[in-house]
From Swiss-Prot:
Organism: Homo sapiens
Domain (C2 tensin-type): residue spans on this chain: 393-522
Region Disordered, annotated ranges: 1-28
Domain of life: Eukaryota
Name of the molecule in the record: Phosphatidylinositol 3,4,5-trisphosphate 3-phosphatase TPTE2
Transmembrane parts of this sequence: 66-86, 111-131, 146-166
Biased composition (Basic and acidic residues): 12-27
SMART domains: PTEN_C2 (SM01326)
Length: 522
C-alpha cells in the first residue's frame, strides 16, 4: 500500500476547547491526525492497486522513467511544435522565393532531414516507454508515424538523387504535387503535435491528481470507488486546452456507463448545457474554496443513495473546477452516507489516497480547506447522531470576536458575517461594534452590539488592507454551523482557519494565531 498523504488538518467535529483568556499552541495541535487505516480501507484500496500498477508498469525501470519525463515534458512538446512550424515555413519560403528552374537546395533538404530524424527519435522513445502494442493502438499515433517516416524517406532519396542523377531536371515540373502533399502532411503533423501539447497542458494543470489513461482516454478523472467518480470540470473552448474536454468526458461516460450515470456539477461560477450528458445533470451552487450547506449535503447524499439503489450499474460522476475541494467534500459525505466509512477522518484520508497519484509526486490532492474538513465532520454527526436528518436549529448571537497573535498593522481590520448568501453583519457600520487592540496580551477584541440572529450555516470573513489576500479575496475566513456550537464558544487555531492553514501564509500568521467567537442566546 502507498504511504499516507500529508496530514489532514482536521480536528474533528467539536471545535470548542476549555475557555481560557489566551490560547496556547498546545491547545490547538489537534489537527495532526494519525492515518486512520482500517482493515476495510486496506481491502478497498487494494482493489485499485492492480489498476495503478498497470498504469505505471511501462515505467518500471529508471531509464523508462527518465525517458518518459523527457518526452512528456512541456519544453519537449513546445520544441516539437516549433520544428514543425520551421519545416513548413522553410518549404513554403523555398517554393515562393526560389527560382523555379533551380533545384531544391541541399541545405533545406538537410534541415528537413534533421527535423525528420528528431521526430523519428521521438516516436521510437515513446514506443520504448509505452510499448509497441499500446502506442500503435492509437490511430493518431499510427498516422503520425507514417507522416514522419514518409517525408523522411523522400528527403533521403532526394538528397541522394539530387547529388547523383537529377541535376538537369527542374523541380517544379516533377515535384510540385509531391511538395503539396508534403505540406499537407506537415500541417497534419502540426495538428497532432498540438494534440500532444494539449495533453501536456492538461497534465500540468491537473498536477499529480490520479488520471484515467486507458482505452484511448487521458482524463483528469478518478474512480474513488467502483461507482463514484471524481473529476475536474468538463470544459469547452479555450479551457478544454488545459482541462477535460467535455466531448471526451461524454464519450467516456457513454462508453463505460451508458444510460447508468448521473453528473453533479458543484460549481457556482460555471456551467454547461446539460444536453451534453443527456440531461442527467444536477447542479449544486457552491463557491470555490467554500462549503455546501448542511442541508445540501443531506439532500445530495439521499438523492445519490436513491439513484444507486435503482440499479447496481448506476454510478455518479462528481466535479467542481479541479475535482478536489468541493468534489472531495461531497464525495466524503457520500462515503459516510453509504457507510463505506463511518468517520470523517477515514473518508477524508481515503479520498486523498485515491485522488493523489504518488508516482508523479507526493503533493496531497485531497480535501485541504479547513472549513470543508469541518463540514465533513458535521455530516458524520448528522448521519450517526441525527439519523441522516438535520440537527435541531439553534439561534445564536455573536457577542465578541477575539483574535490572537496577529502580526503587522491591522488597525483597519474589519469583519463580515454572511448567512444565506447575504451579508448580515459588517463592522464597517457605525455603532454596531467596538474594536480594541490589546498590545500587552497581543489580542484584538471586537465587541458586537445588537448583532443579528444567526442560525444554520454561517460564514465569517476578515478584511485588512495590510494583510495579503488569498482564497475568497480576503486574508482569512471560516464556516461553521450553529447547531454544533458547544458552550456558546467557538475557538479555531491557525490550521482550522481558511487561508492561514496554508504554509505560504505562516510568515503572517504564527502558530499561536487563532480566532475565538463568544456567543449569546436570547
Amino acid at each position: 500500500m502507498n504511504e499516507s498523504p500529508q496530514t489532514n488538518e482536521f480536528k474533528g467535529t467539536t471545535e470548542e476547547a476549555p475557555a481560557k483568556e489566551s490560547p496556547h499552541t498546545s491547545e490547538f495541535k489537534g489537527a495532526a491526525l494519525v492515518s486512520p487505516i482500517s482493515k476495510s480501507m486496506l481491502e478497498r484500496l487494494s482493489k485499485f492497486e492492480v489498476e495503478d500498477a498497470e498504469n505505471v508498469a511501462s515505467y518500471d525501470s529508471k531509464i523508462k522513467k527518465i525517458v518518459h519525463s523527457i518526452v512528456s515534458s512541456f519544453a519537449f512538446g513546445i520544441f516539437g511544435v516549433f520544428l514543425v512550424l520551421l519545416d513548413v515555413t522553410l518549404l513554403l519560403a523555398d517554393l515562393i522565393f526560389t527560382d523555379s528552374k533551380l533545384y531544391i537546395p541541399l541545405e533545406y533538404r538537410s534541415i528537413s532531414l534533421a527535423i525528420g530524424l528528431f521526430f523519428l527519435m521521438d516516436v521510437l522513445l515513446r514506443v520504448f516507454v509505452e510499448g509497441r502494442q499500446q502506442y500503435f493502438s492509437d490511430l493518431f499515433n499510427i498516422l503520425d508515424t507514417a507522416i514522419i517516416v514518409i517525408p523522411l524517406l523522400v528527403d533521403v532519396i532526394y538528397i541522394f538523387f539530387d547529388i547523383k542523377l537529377l541535376r538537369n531536371i527542374p523541380r517544379w515540373t516533377h515535384l510540385v504535387r509531391l511538395l503539396r502533399l508534403i505540406i499537407l502532411i506537415r500541417i497534419f503533423h502540426l495538428l497532432h503535435q498540438k494534440r500532444q501539447l494539449e495533453k501536456l497542458m492538461r497534465r500540468l494543470v491537473s498536477e499529480n491528481k490520479r488520471r484515467y489513461t486507458r482505452d484511448g482516454f487521458d482524463l483528469d478523472l478518478t474512480y474513488v470507488t467502483e461507482r463514484i467518480i471524481a473529476m475536474s470540470f468538463p470544459s469547452s473552448g479555450r479551457q478544454s486546452f488545459y482541462r477535460n474536454p467535455i466531448e471526451e468526458v461524454v464519450r467516456f461516460l457513454d462508453k463505460k456507463h451508458r444510460n447508468h450515470y448521473r453528473v453533479y456539477n458543484l460549481c457556482s461560477e460555471r456551467a454547461y448545457d446539460p444536453k451534453h450528458f443527456h440531461n442527467r445533470v444536477s447542479r449544486i451552487m457552491i463557491d470555490d474554496h467554500n462549503v455546501p450547506t448542511l442541508h445540501e449535503m443531506v439532500v445530495f447524499t439521499k438523492e445519490v443513495n436513491e439513484w444507486m439503489a435503482q440499479d447496481l450499474e448506476n454510478i455518479v460522476a462528481i466535479h467542481c473546477k479541479g475535482g478536489k475541494g468541493r468534489t472531495g467534500t461531497m464525495v466524503c459525505a457520500l462515503l459516510i452516507a453509504s457507510e463505506i466509512f463511518l468517520t470523517a477522518e477515514e473518508s477524508l484520508y481515503y479520498f486523498g489516497e485515491r485522488r493523489t497519484n504518488k508516482t508523479h509526486s507526493n503533493k496531497f490532492q485531497g480535501v485541504e480547506t479547513p472549513s470543508q474538513n469541518r463540514y465533513v465532520g458535521y455530516f458524520a454527526q448528522v448521519k450517526h447522531l441525527y439519523n441522516w436528518n438535520l440537527p435541531p436549529r439553534r439561534i445564536l448571537f455573536i457577542k465578541r470576536f477575539i483574535i490572537y497573535s496577529i502580526r503587522g498593522d491591522v488597525c483597519d481590520l474589519k469583519v463580515q458575517v454572511v448567512m444565506e448568501k447575504k451579508v448580515v453583519f459588517s463592522s464597517t457600520s457605525l455603532g454596531n461594534c467596538s474594536i480594541l487592540h490589546d498590545i500587552e496580551t497581543d489580542k484584538i477584541l471586537i465587541n458586537v452590539y445588537d448583532g443579528p440572529p444567526l442560525y444554520d450555516d454561517v460564514k465569517v470573513q476578515f478584511f485588512s488592507s495590510n494583510l495579503p489576500k488569498y482564497y475568497d479575496n480576503c486574508p482569512f475566513f471560516f464556516w461553521f454551523n450553529t447547531s454544533f456550537i458547544q458552550n456558546n464558544r467557538l475557538c479555531l487555531p491557525r490550521n482550522e482557519l481558511d487561508n492561514p492553514h496554508k504554509q505560504k501564509a505562516w510568515k503572517i500568521y504564527p502558530p499561536e494565531f487563532a480566532v475565538e467567537i463568544l456567543f449569546g442566546e436570547k
